[in-house]
Amino acid sequence: MIKQRTLKQGIKVTGVGLHSGNKVTLNLRPAAANTGVVYCRTDLNPPVSFPADAKAVRDTMLCTALVNDEGVRISTVEHLNAALAGLGIDNIIIEVDAPEIPIMDGSASPFVYLLLDAGIEEQDAPKKFIRVKKKVRVEDGDKWAEILPYNGFRLNFTIDFNHPAITKNLSTYTLDFSAQKFVQQISRARTFAFMKDIEYLQSQGLALGGSLDNAIVLDNYRVLNEEGLRFKDELVRHKMLDSIGDLFMCGYNMIGEFKAYKSGHGLNNKLLRALLEDQEAWEFATFEDKEKVPQGYTVGAQVLI
């Protein structure tokens, strides 16, 4: 039986909030089987919890934010969510003492290594996957995203920026997902921004924690980070990282093929909602026989390093 996963022990880290620029403490704790992914604002009295749910995503400007009916929010959840998806963690309590998850280095890699440091253990309950049964597609102008049946988890993403540093041959990336490929090829890809946008955002009191330490920054001609890029196509890899995190907002790993052109957090969430709302488009899948598990989900997270 393919089993659910949680952490062996809790682990804590401190970082900076991307938008506030303030110190943020993040505490990751194990959770019982069938708990799911639960985000919790511990700075509020009483604390406010947000179970991972596509419908809880109500703000996708610049990041993915969970907002409840009272307007309480947790922003910038997508990179941590991607790390959970990449390692196949089903049950976890995520406590944060601020309205946003710390940005760390702008990628999912710090979260991956935090989770691996805490340790991952299997639980005595079958792991549930969402298996796509028919194609679902959403569009917004020339942007689109779709998910189709596929026996595994494959992703194809294309970006399109009119910028000399983002050439056509660096604008498309395809991944046949596995935990190991996620860690090695996707998790280290950092978020990116253009200098003109950062200056505007900071003038509006946003992105106050943004810097060359936690983002790739481009002017009109080049990448400004002295160390350059971690991959030649790091930008499109990061958009794929975002998509993995956004699709995991349902709390289950996907069995299907995701394709997107110029998609972002909003369109990714629109696709996930459209899929889940169509009862004929998906089903839950569990696997008693490990031999029948789709390619990419067969290797345990313990074999990553």
Swiss-Prot record:
Source organism superkingdom: Bacteria
Q: Does the keyword Endoplasmic reticulum apply?
A: no
Q: Which GO terms describe its biological process?
A: lipid A biosynthetic process
A GO MF annotation of the entry reads: UDP-3-O-acyl-N-acetylglucosamine deacetylase activity
Residues recorded as binding Zn(2+), renumbered to this chain, are 79, 238, 242
Q: Which cysteines are joined by disulfide bonds?
A: none
- GO cellular-component term (any): membrane
Q: In which pathway does it act?
A: Glycolipid biosynthesis; lipid IV(A) biosynthesis; lipid IV(A) from (3R)-3-hydroxytetradecanoyl-[acyl-carrier-protein] and UDP-N-acetyl-alpha-D-glucosamine: step 2/6
Enzyme Commission identifier(s): 3.5.1.108
Q: Which InterPro entries match?
A: Ribosomal_Su5_D2-typ_SF, UDP-acyl_GlcNac_deAcase, UDP-acyl_GlcNac_deAcase_C, UDP-acyl_N-AcGlcN_deAcase_N
Please write the reaction equations for the catalytic activity of this protein: a UDP-3-O-[(3R)-3-hydroxyacyl]-N-acetyl-alpha-D-glucosamine + H2O = a UDP-3-O-[(3R)-3-hydroxyacyl]-alpha-D-glucosamine + acetate
- Cofactor requirement: Zn(2+)
Keyword Transmembrane among record annotations: no
The residues annotated as the active site are 265 (proton donor)
Keyword set for this entry? Hydrolase, Lipid A biosynthesis, Lipid biosynthesis, Lipid metabolism, Metal-binding, Zinc
| Pfam families from the UniProt entry | LpxC (PF03331)
Biological role stated in the UniProt entry: Catalyzes the hydrolysis of UDP-3-O-myristoyl-N-acetylglucosamine to form UDP-3-O-myristoylglucosamine and acetate, the committed step in lipid A biosynthesis.
Give the protein family: Belongs to the LpxC family.
PANTHER family listed in its UniProt record: UDP-3-O-ACYL-N-ACETYLGLUCOSAMINE DEACETYLASE 1, MITOCHONDRIAL-RELATED (PTHR33694:SF1)
- Kindly provide the name given to this protein in its UniProt entry: UDP-3-O-acyl-N-acetylglucosamine deacetylase
Organism classification, top ranks?
Answer: Bacteria, Pseudomonadati, Pseudomonadota, Gammaproteobacteria, Pasteurellales
Q: Which gene encodes it?
A: lpxC
